[in-house]
Design a protein with these regions (language model features):
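Cytoplasmic helix-loop-helix junction between adjacent transmembrane helices
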Residues: 120-155
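Transmembrane alpha-helix termini and helix-breaking/packing motifs in multi-pass membrane transporters
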Residues: 71-76, 103-104, 161-181
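C-terminal ends and interior cores of transmembrane alpha-helices
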Residues: 88-109
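Juxtamembrane intracellular "pre-TM" segments in multi-pass secondary transporters
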Residues: 2-14, 201-234
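Glycine-rich segments within core transmembrane alpha-helices of 12-TM secondary carriers
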Residues: 63-66, 146-171
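Helix-loop boundary and gating motifs at the non-cytosolic
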Residues: 5-63, 230-237, 241-255, 259-262, ...
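A membrane-interface helix-boundary motif in multi-pass transporters
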Residues: 81-88, 112, 169-186
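Symmetry-related core transmembrane helices of the 12-TM Major Facilitator Superfamily/SLC fold
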Residues: 90-97, 177-196
Length: 274
């Protein structure tokens, strides 16, 4: 009995599914690096103090705590585009619009608005990560998962070059207003992917569950597995383990600026080579 020939690696790489993985990685990485690279550079350029910029690292908490509302996104089906693509579209439109709002803000006058807006961006970005991860897992077979995830992660890293390099270079050439508009428009490829390239996964319906079951059962199981004390320790670890790294990352670009490097220097060297 002969087995069917397997497609070559190159054919797998240049398939529709892997192209989608490029888009999911890029559109997932852009908002995160916008927050941790571009916003601190902008704030320091506008003479915001380092203490405030360091505290801005707390806006990354939605990325750590997204497991809390992920059951809701998994259960609630929006009335357009399907279970996954509907949420993808909502989060991507939300990100595009919120990133554009920065173009009309001034840290000297709207610092607290910027903090609140950054928290909203983090929430939309974390929610997008939830649905993109689920979507990618459902469209990829077990054999395709390794390649698809590696492509996704590499595209995620490439996305860092937009707010972390290109936008910083542009900030030396044009007003921040224009920089934010250009950076926000890089969300459009992911949005177009959702509308025209991605197809809703053909997944058979699972056993019907109530909203309460979907939301409460995972937490009940988590707290009952090894007791409340152990669960709280795990949650504290999740909350704290990235906090120091996040604060250090958010202060890296302001540190370079204070040392006298231009934004072009930082964009070309620290963010590209580093």
């Amino acid at each position: 009995m002969t087995t069917a020939p397997q497609p070559s690696t190159w054919r797998k790489i240049f398939s529709r599914k892997m192209l989608i993985c490029i888009f999911t990685g890029f559109t997932s990485g852009l908002p995160l690096y916008f927050l941790i690279n571009l916003i601190p550079a902008w704030l320091r350029s506008e003479h915001v103090d380092l203490k405030t910029i360091g505290l801005m690292a707390l806006i990354g908490l939605p990325f750590t705590w997204k497991f809390i509302w992920s059951p809701v996104i998994d259960l609630v089906r929006l009335p357009f585009l399907g279970r996954r693509r509907g949420w993808m579209l909502v989060t991507q439109i939300g990100l595009l619009l919120t990133l554009l709002i920065y173009a009309f803000l001034n840290p000297a006058q709207h610092l607290y608005v910027i903090m609140g807006l950054s928290l909203v961006v983090a929430f939309f970005s974390a929610s997008q990560d939830i649905v993109l991860d689920a979507f990618r897992r459902e469209i990829l077979s077990d054999e395709e998962l390794g390649l698809g995830n590696s492509i996704h992660v590499n595209a995620y890293r490439i996305a860092a070059l937009v707010p972390g390099s290109l936008s910083l270079i542009l900030a030396d050439l044009m007003p921040w207003h224009n920089v934010f508009i250009i950076t926000a428009l890089f969300m459009l490829p992911g949005l177009l992917m959702t509308l025209f390239l991605a197809k809703e996964p053909d997944i058979p319906p699972s056993v019907s569950r109530t909203f309460a079951q979907t939301v409460s059962d995972p937490f009940s199981e988590f707290f009952s597995r090894k007791g409340i004390k152990q669960a709280i320790l795990v949650l504290l670890f999740i909350f704290l383990y990235k906090l120091g790294d996040s604060m250090a990352t958010s202060l890296a670009t302001p540190f370079y600026l204070d040392m006298g490097f231009s934004k072009t220097d930082i964009g070309l060297i620290a963010k590209n080579a580093g």
